């Protein structure tokens, strides 16, 4: 190898070796840093998961009981309402015959059901009918 100039072959080889050694040591440092960074990332992830888990546990302890109590109260209220509806009897129920009761139940079902009324199109019907002049004979 001839490099020209005043530098001797020895100096050039020393520089090449020095560059190779520093590049090797840099890659080793990078590998060490990568493993350290990976370890650091994993430990941070575990710490975050633990913190999140503790946060959710605390939230669950605080709010789960109130939710259960509220749910139980709502269920109890619904049960009482259904029992009251089933037990309620109007004063006229004793006066009605079984047939009249059935008719009243049927009427209440008909009127409580939502229905869609039919549209009446009288205007169109009149326009479609051809008009003939009145001829008196």
UniProtKB/Swiss-Prot annotation:
The keyword Phosphoprotein does not apply. Keywords: Cell cycle. It holds the Pfam family Spo12. One of its GO terms (biological process) is meiotic cell cycle. InterPro entries: Spo12. Component of the FEAR (CDC14 early anaphase release) network which promotes CDC14 release from the nucleolus during early anaphase and is required for the efficient segregation of telomeric and nucleolar regions. Although BNS1 can partially compensate for a lack of SPO12 function when overexpressed, it does not appear to play any role in controlling meiotic nuclear division. This is Protein BNS1. The gene is BNS1.
